[in-house]
Amino acid sequence: MNNSTLWENIFSQKEWGKYPSENLIRFIAKNFYNVKDRSKINILELGLGTGANLWFCAKEGFSVSGIEWSKTGVERFKQRLENENLSHHIQEIKIGDYEQKLDEY
């Protein structure tokens, strides 16, 4: 089973990752509390899963990009941002191998 199939099976079987990492929340609060225009800062996440961390970053006003193996994970992330009127924060989301896709950034 390749990585793409593995992660597709994981994300298509149940709901995953609704809440962001506590470490990310602390990091953003500590380092970006006083930044007035966060939309000029692009956050790139490798292995975004269903996008809980990028959702938080978009909600905080950052532009977001990511790479993920699972098409289902990406679809759930995009749907969540669309449902919450945050999809305008998405710069680029790619599906596939990190090593290959990272060169495209």
Segment roles from a protein language model:
Residues 1-49:
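Conserved class I S-adenosyl-L-methionine
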Residues 63-68:
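Conserved SAM-binding motif I beta-strand of class I
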Residues 77-78:
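Conserved SAM-binding loop
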